């Protein structure tokens, strides 16, 4: 287990987060993930309204982050693990990005060196039987990001 795995375990404890990831802010390298990823899904093709689009999730995510949460490739949009997300709010001051997808969403907190990502799916239950929800995901993601910022990350 890498030193970063404990942070992802914090995110996913009690099944409050569907997927937890920590990525390098500059290159998108996955530092830790609860799904064993070493990279986001890159270099695949999707069909959008009859048009083929090549997807590089890492590049698209970082480009949107640097564009205040607005995708720079509108055909691909923002995708995490081949699921399309839409920006609900990007708060540049607090460095938090809230996203929505069918039956769920994500919270991305940005630190000096990393992106802390937690996704949720309202059709999945936490350990306490309550559906995964944005409030809980936002709380754990933002809390972990604050801890990493204090540690210089």
Swiss-Prot record:
The record's subunit annotation is: Occurs in many kinds of cells as a complex with monomeric actin in a 1:1 ratio.
Q: What is this protein called?
A: Profilin
Member of which family?
Belongs to the profilin family.
Record's subcellular location: Cytoplasm, Cytoskeleton
User: A Pfam family this protein belongs to?
Assistant: Profilin
- InterPro entries per the record? PFN, PFN_euk, PFN_sf, Profilin_CS
- Keyword annotations of the record: Actin-binding, Cytoplasm, Cytoskeleton
Primary role = Binds to actin and affects the structure of the cytoskeleton. At high concentrations, profilin prevents the polymerization of actin, whereas it enhances it at low concentrations. By binding to PIP2, it inhibits the formation of IP3 and DG.
Q: Which organism is it from?
A: Tetrahymena pyriformis
Q: Which GO terms describe its molecular function?
A: actin monomer binding
Can you tell which superkingdom this protein's organism belongs to? Eukaryota
CDD domains with a match to the protein in the record? PROF
**Is Cytoplasm included in the keywords of this UniProt record?**
yes
Q: Does the keyword Plastid apply?
A: no
Give the UniProt entry's GO cellular component terms: cell cortex; cytoskeleton
């Amino acid at each position: 287990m890498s030193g970063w795995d404990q942070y992802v375990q914090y995110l996913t404890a009690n099944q409050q987060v569907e997927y937890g990831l920590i990525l390098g802010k500059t290159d998108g390298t996955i530092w830790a993930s609860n799904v064993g990823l070493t990279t986001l899904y890159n270099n695949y093709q999707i069909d959008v309204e009859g048009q083929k689009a090549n997807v590089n999730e890492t590049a698209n995510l970082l480009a949107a982050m640097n564009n205040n949460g607005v995708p720079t490739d509108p055909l691909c949009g923002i995708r995490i693990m081949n699921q399309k997300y839409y920006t609900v709010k990007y708060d540049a001051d607090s460095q938090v990005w809230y996203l929505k997808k069918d039956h769920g969403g994500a919270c991305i907190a940005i630190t000096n060196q990393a992106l802390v990502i937690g996704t949720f799916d309202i059709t999945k239950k936490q350990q306490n039987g309550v559906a995964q929800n944005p409030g809980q995901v936002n709380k754990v993601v933002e809390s972990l990001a604050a801890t990493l910022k204090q540690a210089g990350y």
